[in-house]
């Protein structure tokens, strides 16, 4: 007899087959869990390669109902009806992977003809295959952007998952070993060495490299906890860091979870995961897909999506399930924690927790950790240390001062503790409270001589004061650009300097230690540069000399700075006031009244280009720098609010700049944009991210103007792309402009300006641009492929994993995608309480500081390479007659000059009204 499925080869099955009653009547719709040896079905399954991305179904032919005549497989679908866009996209991705596998197979055969051959292992002959190690070696030798064995293993795992590669024994996990053999299915491909095929191979390897980490993570999760390697546990832990459901847990708990998580897939929508009233046995985290939460009497209560969790309450309270969970879509994946593991982790955490009390109240909560212990590595005896989990501000500061050591390295846990505290103290310990506490510690002396010796008592006091000075030096280094205009801070520093000058022993130690420390342990400031701190005098000199300016602070907006407030009237006349950047709306109205431009009863509102009006609260601060793109402030009588119209300048340009852009190459334009963006990015103080997420209502006398200016630039760039394309009326030049913007995005990515790269790509994906089908059709095939390759970095799945992996591979200087960093900060802030049992949740502060330090890493090289155009500015002679000998007009020459291009990229004029962009788009292509 023959067993087959449509479109594949037929295999002959011998007549000596014994039917077993155990599999004589399997149900249509799925394969049995256990198939006994010697049965027909068992033999078929052994011979058949079944990709994991497919489901399988038994099909009985009615001519012989007592025998299994055939077996067919059908792809998983995500809906009961017709395939939707998501299914089509998944199928297209599978097709791309199969095509990539064939291209790789062809190239490997052409480069290494003996790679695929018959192999004999343990007296068994395996036809036309290669070992896992040889396949990885071959992929690495090809280059093509693959630089490590783990990356090559990920590529092979993707091919294995999609059926483009198969194991000779149908194992699902790719292994980089000599004794594991794999083959490419299908006939041997014909050789082809054209240039187009090579480009397709590069594109194919980029696709496989992008999907490789996800495949390796899936394999790690599918393994039982006891089989996971250290590297796989680290990989799972990094995934948990970005999952919303566990954001409130400490890193030690996340590492414990990484060791016990179980992978649980379900293929069919409508499957009931558990029912209301069932006994709670597991906690679930949605890794892929969504579920409906249904209760008796209320029906559908809510829908949970990727990153959400459910089932924890029943475990904590040891109660029955409070709702029924039903799969909302096909192919859902869950991360499961069983009850016994959950309870063990909770007990372990409690056992490692130490609480310090004063006067009957808990003032500090510490957690015991082991230095050098990873998620799977056992603790090292004798190397335990305690990490602050929560506490009062004063106790956290006291513990920090006790833990500081003068000889600690940059990677010492105490240094990280100090950095976390300094970056986040404004959230829980304002400067005035910090100053008072530090002065108190400076004056406090032990009640009894330490060890009974007056000398040791004096040494203890001196060491403690040294630690205070070291903390203050680090604090000044971090915040020095913001402190010069702060009278409270300068008064505190003066008091501390006076106290130091009265202590002879401390002054002598400072004179000996600080010059050497400046050479070997230079302190970081808020912009990622270094600055000298304390000088060898009787008292510390906290700020750098004027001869040593901080280059990155030039042009930054500080708290005491005055900025222009452009106030519009209903008749569109404009009044400009210069007020402090942190001025409140009430103070702005008072300044207007002082200038006799405000009458009683008038209010301040902001109006955008679409005519939407939003009132400004009297206590709102920094409204001038927080305005959105093309927004203006209006002073108006309340009865005239609904009659306001946008200022003409808010509406944007009516003519495009395509002629000027034609004269500048995409690479030079990217260089100009990157240099301008770097200047804006370098002026952002690290702590502005924390202030921005907390909001001005939580913190006074701070500004986030530099960060808001950078964010406004992101919006400006994406609308600039859409504006220029919508204002280009001729199809040919419009297609050329579209091509230039795609190349611009590629150059921005190459220059590691990821923020502007995302802005340009978002502009190209604007609905007003994506609908211009005739314009996109004019693009060459190569440019369309380039755009498709760039789009992969925008993939938002699994919390933008593709972008995050790409970012980790880049060396500084880098301009990161700022909106995602702010999203992470908001995620941390809103997902974790600032107070836990009336104590500061310092674990939350630690997570926020870790996210903020990304800015310092990206700016650890303080200068960005100048763009080619800017580097030539100094060589341009204004009176050069030779430059005028050209067929171009003087206007064209001035347009293409570096100075004019530099001015253009700084003052982009855009249309940000989506309705207007859509109208222009419909006029171009109805």
Swiss-Prot record:
Pfam (any one): cNMP_binding
Binding locations of 3',5'-cyclic AMP: 311-314, 321-322
Modified residues (Phosphoserine): 79, 531, 867
DEP domain boundaries: 110-186
Annotated tissue distribution: Expressed at low levels in adult brain. Strongly expressed in parts of the neonatal brain, including the septum and the thalamus.
Chain ranges of the Ras-GEF domain: 665-892
Any GO molecular function: guanyl-nucleotide exchange factor activity
Cellular component terms per the entry's GO annotation: apical part of cell; axon terminus; basal plasma membrane; basolateral part of cell; brush border membrane; cortical actin cytoskeleton; filopodium; growth cone
Recorded topology in the membrane: Peripheral membrane protein
Residue segments, region Disordered: 369-388
Superkingdom, natural source: Eukaryota
Residue intervals of the N-terminal Ras-GEF domain: 384-521
Keywords: Angiogenesis, cAMP, cAMP-binding, Cytoplasm, Guanine-nucleotide releasing factor, Membrane, Nucleotide-binding, Phosphoprotein
Xref: SUPFAM superfamilies: cAMP-binding domain-like (SSF51206), Ras GEF (SSF48366), Ubiquitin-like (SSF54236), Winged helix' DNA-binding domain (SSF46785)
GO biological process, one term: positive regulation of GTPase activity
Chief localisation class: cytoplasm
Subcellular location: Cytoplasm; Membrane
Region of interest called Interaction with PDE3B, as start-end residue ranges on this chain: 218-242, 398-422
InterPro entries with a match to the protein in the record: cNMP-bd_dom, cNMP-bd_dom_sf, DEP_dom, Ras-like_GEF, Ras-like_Gua-exchang_fac_N, Ras_G-nucl-exch_fac_CS, Ras_GEF_dom_sf, RASGEF_cat_dom
Function: Guanine nucleotide exchange factor (GEF) for RAP1A and RAP2A small GTPases that is activated by binding cAMP. Through simultaneous binding of PDE3B to RAPGEF3 and PIK3R6 is assembled in a signaling complex in which it activates the PI3K gamma complex and which is involved in angiogenesis. Plays a role in the modulation of the cAMP-induced dynamic control of endothelial barrier function through a pathway that is independent on Rho-mediated signaling. Required for the actin rearrangement at cell-cell junctions, such as stress fibers and junctional actin.
Free-text comment about domains: The DEP domain is involved in membrane localization independent from regulation by cAMP.
Protein name, as recorded: Rap guanine nucleotide exchange factor 3
């Amino acid at each position: 007899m023959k067993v087959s499925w449509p479109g594949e080869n037929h295999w002959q099955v011998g007549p000596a087959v014994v039917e077993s009653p155990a599999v004589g009547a399997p149900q249509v719709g799925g394969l049995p869990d256990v198939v006994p040896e010697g049965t027909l079905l068992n033999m078929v399954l052994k011979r058949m390669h079944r990709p994991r991305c497919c489901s399988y179904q038994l099909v009985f032919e009615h001519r012989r109902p007592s025998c299994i005549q055939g077996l067919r497989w059908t792809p998983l679908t995500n809906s009961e009806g017709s395939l939707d866009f998501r299914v089509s996209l998944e199928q297209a991705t599978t097709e791309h992977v199969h095509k990539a596998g064939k291209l790789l197979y062809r190239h490997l055969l052409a480069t290494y003809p003996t790679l695929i051959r018959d192999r004999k292992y343990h007296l068994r002959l395996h036809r036309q295959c290669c070992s896992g190690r040889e396949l990885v070696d071959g992929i690495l030798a090809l280059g093509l952007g693959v630089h490590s064995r783990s990356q090559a293993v990920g590529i092979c795992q993707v091919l294995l998952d999609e059926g483009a590669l198969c194991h000779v024994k149908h194992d699902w996990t790719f292994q980089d070993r000599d004794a594991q053999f794999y083959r490419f299915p299908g006939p041997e491909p014909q050789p082809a060495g054209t240039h187009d095929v090579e480009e397709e191979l590069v594109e194919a390897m980029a696709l496989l490299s992008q999907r490789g980490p996800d495949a390796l993570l899936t394999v790690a999760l599918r393994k039982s906890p006891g089989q996971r390697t250290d590297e796989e546990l680290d990989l799972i832990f990094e995934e948990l860091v970005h999952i919303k459901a566990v954001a409130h847990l400490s890193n030690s708990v996340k590492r414990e979870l990484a060791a016990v998580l179980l992978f649980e897939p379900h293929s069919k929508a409508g499957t009931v995961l558990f029912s209301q009233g069932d006994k709670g046995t597991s906690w679930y985290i949605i890794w892929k897909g969504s579920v409906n939460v249904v209760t008796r009497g209320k029906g559908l209560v809510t829908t949970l999506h990727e990153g959400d969790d459910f089932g924890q309450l029943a475990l904590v309270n040891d109660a029955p399930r409070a709702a029924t969970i039903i799969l909302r879509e096909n192919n859902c994946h869950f991360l499961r924690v069983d009850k016994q593991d959950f309870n063990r982790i909770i007990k372990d955490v409690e056992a490692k927790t130490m609480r310090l009390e004063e006067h009957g109240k808990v003032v500090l909560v510490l957690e015991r950790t082991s230095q050098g212990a990873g998620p799977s590595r056992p603790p090292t005896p004798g190397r335990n240390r305690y990490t602050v989990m929560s506490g009062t501000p004063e106790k956290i500061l006291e513990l920090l001062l006790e833990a500081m050591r003068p000889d600690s390295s940059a990677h010492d846990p105490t240094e990280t503790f100090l950095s976390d505290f300094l970056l986040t103290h404004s959230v829980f310990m304002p400067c005035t409270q910090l100053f008072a506490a530090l002065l108190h510690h400076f004056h406090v002396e032990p009640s009894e001589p330490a060890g009974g010796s007056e000398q040791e008592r004096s040494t203890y006091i001196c060491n403690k004061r040294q630690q205070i000075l070291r903390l203050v030096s680090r604090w000044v280094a971090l915040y020095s650009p913001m402190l010069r205009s702060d009278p409270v801070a300068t008064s505190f520093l003066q008091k501390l300097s006076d106290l130091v000058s009265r202590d002879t022993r401390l002054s002598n130690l400072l004179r000996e230690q600080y010059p050497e420390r400046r050479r070997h342990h230079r302190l970081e400031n808020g912009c990622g540069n270094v600055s000298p701190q304390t000088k060898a005098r009787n008292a510390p000199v906290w700020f750098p000399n004027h001869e040593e300016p901080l280059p990155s602070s030039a042009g930054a907006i500080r708290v005491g700075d005055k900025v222009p407030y452009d106030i519009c009237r209903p008749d569109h006349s404009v009044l400009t006031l210069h007020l402090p950047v942190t001025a409140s709306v009430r103070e702005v109205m008072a300044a207007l009244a002082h200038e006799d431009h405000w009458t009683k009863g008038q209010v301040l509102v902001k109006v955008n280009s679409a005519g939407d009006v939003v009132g400004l609260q009297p206590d709102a601060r920094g409204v001038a720098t927080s305005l959105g793109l093309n927004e203006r402030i209006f002073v108006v009588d309340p009865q005239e609010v609904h009659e306001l119209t946008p200022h003409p300048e808010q509406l944007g340009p009516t003519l495009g700049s395509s002629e000027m852009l034609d004269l500048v190459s995409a690479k030079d334009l990217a260089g100009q944009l990157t240099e301008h963006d770097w200047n804006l990015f370098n002026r952002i103080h690290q702590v502005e991210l924390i202030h921005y997420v907390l909001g001005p209502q939580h913190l006074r006398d701070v500004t986030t103007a530099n960060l808001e200016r950078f964010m406004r630039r992101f919006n400006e760039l994406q609308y600039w792309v859409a504006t220029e394309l919508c204002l280009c009326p001729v199809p040919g030049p419009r297609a050329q402009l579209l091509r230039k913007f795609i190349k611009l995005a590629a150059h921005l990515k190459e220059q590691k300006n990821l923020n502007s790269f995302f802005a340009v790509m978002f502009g190209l994906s604007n609905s007003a641009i994506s609908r211009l089908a005739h314009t996109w059709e004019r693009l060459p095939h190569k440019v369309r492929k380039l755009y498709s390759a760039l789009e992969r970095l925008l993939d938002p799945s699994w919390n933008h994993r593709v972008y995050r992996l790409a970012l980790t591979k880049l060396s500084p200087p880098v301009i990161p995608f700022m909106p995602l960093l702010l999203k992470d900060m908001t995620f941390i802030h809103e997902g974790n309480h600032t107070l836990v049992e009336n104590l500061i949740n310092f674990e939350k502060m630690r997570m926020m500081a870790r996210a903020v330090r990304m800015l310092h890493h990206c700016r650890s090289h303080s200068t960005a390479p100048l763009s080619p155009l800017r580097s030539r500015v100094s060589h341009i002679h204004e009176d050069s007659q030779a430059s005028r000998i050209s067929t171009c007009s003087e206007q064209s020459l001035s347009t293409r000059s570096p100075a004019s291009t530099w001015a253009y990229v700084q003052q982009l004029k855009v249309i940000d009204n989506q309705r207007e962009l859509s109208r222009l788009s419909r006029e171009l292509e109805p």
